[in-house]
């Protein structure tokens, strides 16, 4: 299984909007419950840098673009960014969830 790690830094004046939009996005994920997806969002200590970790099970097409709130978040993020996002592919070596 692979993962996408995305690091984004937003302009400080948009941080509250980002946080509100992240909550709306996760509410939509809870409603839609897409299978085979692990999606996590983190805010770093500086308050303006965010990490997203996306894992999609092998053999599954990414279902997130079919969710309107995900598309809206992606579109709005373009205007909130202070710098281009940094995406990186990662290989999952272990993943424990209780």
What spans do the regions from the language model cover?
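Short, surface-exposed ligand-recognition loops at beta-strand->loop->(often short) alpha-helix junctions
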Residues: 9-20
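An amphipathic, aromatic/His-enriched active-site/gating alpha helix that lines ligand/cofactor pockets
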Residues: 28-37, 54-88
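Short beta-strand micro-motifs enriched in acidic
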Residues: 42-44
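A short, glycine/Asx- and small/polar-enriched loop/turn
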Residues: 46-49
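Short amphipathic alpha-helix segments
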Residues: 20-29
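Short, low-order "capping/linker" segments at domain edges
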Residues: 91-98
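Active-site-flanking beta-strand signature of metal-NTP-handling nucleotidyl enzymes
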Residues: 1-9, 51-53
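Short hydrophobic/aromatic beta-strand element in the GNAT-like acyltransferase core
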Residues: 3, 38-39
